[in-house]
């Protein structure tokens, strides 16, 4: 065997061809008996080697001359069989077949992989195959395109079938491969159902399919034009066989132009479809009546937006706020300018005359309703094709296209030529027999070249107008937030949801290559932070100096006035520990001076340090993207706190549906967010400090602590200035200004932005909106959603914030948010109304949503964010998110345990009662009442009883009952305040004495001596035993008091029953006494 036959490519090609021909064995056997191609003679192996080498050299020479690509001879042979069926010796018996020495009837033929298409004269009517094998077989010396193999169907985020399953079984492959026509894309193979998808759930794929089905008339497959050209090429091949090679070269050149590799090619081929061409298409699809209704509805909607802004400006007294009046006036002027620009573009696009413009502008004055104008826009119509060709060419084109396309493609691309009455009656309901997601989600905008062969076009007027308006809004290469609000409001009038608009925006931008550029985005705002820090430097120095003076005055005055008392307390404490002689100095003039000066210095230090920390600048300000798909809108989220070191600010918003747009999260001041999120440290610290002061009050320095509690209450300057809550509030306000600078600089793209935040994050957004109003930056913010905002309701600020938002402004509050009700008001809010705990009234355009059913407290906002987002209308994939498991720090656990042990020890020490623990005489101290002492002793005895395990008691009972009784008497005493057993014993003694007196009286009567004697003998003193004291069980109730169940019932004795006297039986109970 020669070296050429041992080449690896030849062996692999042979194996591939053998497997391919084996799959269609029956078809090969039938033609082997009837076709004359087996009559060709076969030569020896040497001839095969010579012919093989010569053919290979000719191919390489020809490739150097004209650069044409080779094609597998197998494809040509199969095309001859699938074509007209005429036998040809040139095409049937190649030199390689003649000299192979292998019987074709027994084994599959190994054709020459280097056989050129120009070496043989093709049979008229043959079809060229465009499978991936033909591309991979061409040996051009570079990287070969390898087909992707998968065991299941995979869909992309648009719902398109990206990769079909590769069936390795020969039987299944024989069933699927012959049904695929030449040139058909792999997206239509095995696409009759929804298979595995990379999207979050199958529901998303089905939703995308239903939404995209409504706009299929505006889009077409990317390969449709190629298929139509290939069908026209086959007609030319049938008529003129001599021009086959030229047509093949032309088709190959077209394939080269269509296939673009971003890693191999330097310049991307230019696509003729753009925004302007699509605008011309949509304009031609509308009638005059629909155009006037379209323009009139947009005019009315724009006037409504201007009216709402004017109503908002009238909510406040403009005369008393001149600066605010100027800002609101500029906002109204800018809104009017935007309206003029949008309407002028629309008039020019649709060709509206000046007289018609005047008529349309007066529609709002006549109180025309939108529902009346939009009735004609909610229909599906069948219109004449404006790009129709001649009738003869149309019929030929339809016939050839029908031959070359599968039934699924015919339904997807040619169904417009035969309008369906069911589809026209219910345009929004897709048919059950339509092809699924893979074949109905194309990626190319409708091209007139693709529909020239159609007589009628079925269009949905509403979606055509939405597409036209969307492209009009993007005409200046910027997407204003007011334009998107106008688009969504208009879609609601046409009975479309915002989610469908998001799907449509994504589809249009993907088709026209209009994605938002992300290369120029800035993720770290160092420049803006530096500028803000410089502008704030002088203000910070002034505030620090003021706080220093104020702190020195507060502590200096309080320390100077109370210096004698403080000095006396210090002297008393020192004398307690054995240091004497300091009383005269500390209570004199010298001590007073020392205390006053020290208090002044300490106050100045506390004030300066606290204000410096509070006026600090923002050090961390970054953006963390969660969904970055280059969409035309952005959702920016701001978290209120972080839980632990491993927490992520994107986690509460991680369940938002990606179709809503790009989603970024603001990562700012992580140390401060972690300190807030770990615990409610502010309230807990205040309570803990109070308990420590009480603990210290029972120690040696009792007099000192008690004497300086008043100046400490007056001098909580440090806590007021630099507590974590106040510092976080001021830092959030500063971060909002930096966010405003970022949005003004368009660092996140020239697109509408939706802001979502909770707790401190909502305060960041609120500060950003006010700063945008001050900077007169309009058209940036589309929607705002605030939850649990720690901000005071000031009407001026609310009006400023609402004026820069074009869409919805939602305030989420909770009635059970005690955190804001107590802490925020105590720290900064005073008695003013807070946004996070009450509704906002008397301000136009603000929605109030009560979140109490989802939020029990302030710390539940983070956990309930997916539910709240779903409540306000944002699509979410799940109502819960999975927390990040954080590893416990051993040092932190050890520190917490030590702190708990110290607190327990201090409380135990405080609870111990000492008889002589101070210099105050005992008779001067307040005394407790007797009943208080008794209750405390009973409680302590009950605790001692509870400390004894039950198992030990049972064991002691079994071993030695006497010892157990002694232990029980010592450790288990009755917790009741009254000894019921003693009372019962005294009662029995009284009854016995009364009984003896009665017997003596009876003995004095005559005739009854014998009976009395017999009774005395029977009831002698030696035989009489009073009832013993009942054993009292230990208390079982948790409060250790058993007044209701104490004692036992007293039953009558035997001698109480006198049959002669028939005395009445009486029962006595201890509780009745």
Swiss-Prot record:
GO terms for biological process: clathrin-coated vesicle cargo loading. Keywords: Cytoplasmic vesicle, Endosome, Glycoprotein, Golgi apparatus, Hydrolase, Membrane, Phosphoprotein, Transmembrane, Transmembrane helix. Residues 252-267 have a biased composition (Acidic residues). The modification Phosphoserine is found at residues 435, 1037. Residues 233-249 have a biased composition (Low complexity). Glycans are attached at residues 190, 229, 236, 280, 411, 495, 726, 850. GO terms for cellular component: clathrin-coated vesicle membrane; early endosome membrane; Golgi membrane; membrane. It is found in: Golgi apparatus membrane; Early endosome membrane; Cytoplasmic vesicle, Clathrin-coated vesicle membrane. Residues 1-151, 163-190, 230-267, 385-448, 942-968, 1010-1073 are annotated as: Disordered. The keyword Membrane applies. It is a multi-pass membrane protein. Its EC number is 3.1.1.-. Residues 54-81, 101-121 have a biased composition (Basic and acidic residues). The chain crosses the membrane at residues 292-312, 457-477, 553-573, 577-597, 818-838. One of its GO terms (molecular function) is hydrolase activity. Residues 1027-1037 have a biased composition (Pro residues). It comes from the Eukaryota. Changing residue 858 to A: Increases sensitivity to sertraline. PANTHER family: TRANSMEMBRANE AND COILED-COIL DOMAIN-CONTAINING PROTEIN 4, TRANSMEMBRANE AND COILED-COIL DOMAIN-CONTAINING PROTEIN 4 TMCO4. Probable lipase that recruits the AP-1-related (AP-1R) complex to membranes via interaction with APM2. The AP-1R complex is an adapter protein complex that mediates of cargo protein SNC1 sorting in clathrin-coated vesicles. Belongs to the TMCO4 family. Interacts with RPP0. Interacts with APM2. This is Probable lipase MIL1.
């Amino acid at each position: 065997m020669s070296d050429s036959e041992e080449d690896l490519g030849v062996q692999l090609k042979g194996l591939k061809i053998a497997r391919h021909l084996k799959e269609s064995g029956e078809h090969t056997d039938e033609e082997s008996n009837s076709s004359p191609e087996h009559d060709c003679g076969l030569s020896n192996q040497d001839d095969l080697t010579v012919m093989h080498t010569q053919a290979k050299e000719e191919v390489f020479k020809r490739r150097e001359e004209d650069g044409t690509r080779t094609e597998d001879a197998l494809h040509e042979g199969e095309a001859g069989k699938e074509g007209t069926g005429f036998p040809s010796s040139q095409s049937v018996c190649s030199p390689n077949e003649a000299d192979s020495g292998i019987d074709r009837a027994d084994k599959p033929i190994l054709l020459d992989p280097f056989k050129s298409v120009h070496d043989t004269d093709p049979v008229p009517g043959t079809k060229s195959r465009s499978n991936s094998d033909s591309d991979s077989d061409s040996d051009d010396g570079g990287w070969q395109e390898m087909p992707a193999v998968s065991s299941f169907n995979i869909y992309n985020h648009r719902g398109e079938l990206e990769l079909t399953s590769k069936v390795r079984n020969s039987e299944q492959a024989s069933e699927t491969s012959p049904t695929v026509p030449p040139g058909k894309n792999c997206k239509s193979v095995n696409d009759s159902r929804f298979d595995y998808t990379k999207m979050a759930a199958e529901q998303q794929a089905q939703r995308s399919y239903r939404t995209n089905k409504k706009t299929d008339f505006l889009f077409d497959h990317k390969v449709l034009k190629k298929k139509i050209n290939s069908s026209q090429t086959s007609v030319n091949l049938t008529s003129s066989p001599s021009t086959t090679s030229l047509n093949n070269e032309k088709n190959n050149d077209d394939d080269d132009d269509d296939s673009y590799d971003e890693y191999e090619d330097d310049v991307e081929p230019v696509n003729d479809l753009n925004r302007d061409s699509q605008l011309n298409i949509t304009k031609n699809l509308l009638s005059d009546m629909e155009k006037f209704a379209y323009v009139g509805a947009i005019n009315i909607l724009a006037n409504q937006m201007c009216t709402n802004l004017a109503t908002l400006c009238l909510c406040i007294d403009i005369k008393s706020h001149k600066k605010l009046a100027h800002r609101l006036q500029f906002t109204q002027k800018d809104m009017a300018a935007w309206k003029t620009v949008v309407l002028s573009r629309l008039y020019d696009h649709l060709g509206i005359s000046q007289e018609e413009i005047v008529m349309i502008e007066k529609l709002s004055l006549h109180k025309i309703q939108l529902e009346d104008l939009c009735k004609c826009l909610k229909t599906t119509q069948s219109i004449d094709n404006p790009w129709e060709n001649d009738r003869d060419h149309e019929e030929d084109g339809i016939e050839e296209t029908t031959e070359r396309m599968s039934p699924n493609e015919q339904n997807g691309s040619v169904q417009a030529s035969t309008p369906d009455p069911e589809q026209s009656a219910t345009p929004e309901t897709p048919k059950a027999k339509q092809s699924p997601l893979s074949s109905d989600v194309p990626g190319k905008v409708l091209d007139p070249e693709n529909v020239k062969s159609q007589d009628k076009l079925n269009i949905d007027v509403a979606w055509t107008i939405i597409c036209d308006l969307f492209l009009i809004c993007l005409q200046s290469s910027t997407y204003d937030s007011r334009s998107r609000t106008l688009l969504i409001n208009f879609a609601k009038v046409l009975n479309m949801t915002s989610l469908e608009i998001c799907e449509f925006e994504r589809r249009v931008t993907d088709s026209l290559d209009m994605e938002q550029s992300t290369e120029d985005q800035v993720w770290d705002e160092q420049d803006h932070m530096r500028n803000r820090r410089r502008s704030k430097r002088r203000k910070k120095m002034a505030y620090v100096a003021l706080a220093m003076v104020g702190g020195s005055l507060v502590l200096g005055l309080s320390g100077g006035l109370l210096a004698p008392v403080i000095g006396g307390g210090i002297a008393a404490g020192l004398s307690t520990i054995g240091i004497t002689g300091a009383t005269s100095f500390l209570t004199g003039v010298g001590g007073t001076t020392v205390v006053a000066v020290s208090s002044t210095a300490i106050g100045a230090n506390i004030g300066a340090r606290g204000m410096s920390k509070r006026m600090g600048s923002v050090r961390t300000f970054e953006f963390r993207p969660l969904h970055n798909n280059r969409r035309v809108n952005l959702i920016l989220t701001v978290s209120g706190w972080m839980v632990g070191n491993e927490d992520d600010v994107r986690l509460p918003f991680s369940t938002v549906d990606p179709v809503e747009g790009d989603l970024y999260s603001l990562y700012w001041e992580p140390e401060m967010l972690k300190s807030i999120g770990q615990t409610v440290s502010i309230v807990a610290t205040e309570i803990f400090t109070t308990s420590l002061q009480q603990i210290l009050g029972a120690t040696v320095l009792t007099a000192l602590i008690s004497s300086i509690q008043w100046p400490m209450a007056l001098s909580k300057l440090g806590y007021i200035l630099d507590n974590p809550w106040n510092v976080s509030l001021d830092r959030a306000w500063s971060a909002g200004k930096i966010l405003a600078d970022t949005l003004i600089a368009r660092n996140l793209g020239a697109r509408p932005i939706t802001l979502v935040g909770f707790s401190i994050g909502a305060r960041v957004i609120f500060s950003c909106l006010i700063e945008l109003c001050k900077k007169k930056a309009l058209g940036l913010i589309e929607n705002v959603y605030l939850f649990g905002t720690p901000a005071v309701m000031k009407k001026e600020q609310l009006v400023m914030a609402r004026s820069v938002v074009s869409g919805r402004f939602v305030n989420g509050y909770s009635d059970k948010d005690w955190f804001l009700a107590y802490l925020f008001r105590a720290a900064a809010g005073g008695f003013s109304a807070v946004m996070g705990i009450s509704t906002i009234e008397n301000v136009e355009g603000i929605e109030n949503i009560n979140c109490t059913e989802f939020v029990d407290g302030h710390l539940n906002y983070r956990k309930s964010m997916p539910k709240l987002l779903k409540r306000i209308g944002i699509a979410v994939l799940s109502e819960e998110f999975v927390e990040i498991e954080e590893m416990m720090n051993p040092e932190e656990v050890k520190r917490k345990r030590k702190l708990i042990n110290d607190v327990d020890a201090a409380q135990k020490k405080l609870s111990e009662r000492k008889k002589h623990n101070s210099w105050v005489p005992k008779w001067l101290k307040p005394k407790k009442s007797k009943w208080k002492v008794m209750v405390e002793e009973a409680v302590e005895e009950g605790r001692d009883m509870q400390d004894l395990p039950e198992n030990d008691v049972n064991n002691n009972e079994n071993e030695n009952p006497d010892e157990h009784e002694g232990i029980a008497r010592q450790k288990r005493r009755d917790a009741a305040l009254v000894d019921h057993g003693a009372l019962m014993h005294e009662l029995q003694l009284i009854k016995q004495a009364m009984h003896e007196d009665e017997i003596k009286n009876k003995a004095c009567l005559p005739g009854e001596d014998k009976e009395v004697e017999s009774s005395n003998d029977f009831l002698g003193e030696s035989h009489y035993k009073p009832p013993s004291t009942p054993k009292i069980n230990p208390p079982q109730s948790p409060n250790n008091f058993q007044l209701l169940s104490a004692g036992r019932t007293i039953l009558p004795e035997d001698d109480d029953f006198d049959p002669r006297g028939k005395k009445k039986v009486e029962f006595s109970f201890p509780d009745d006494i």
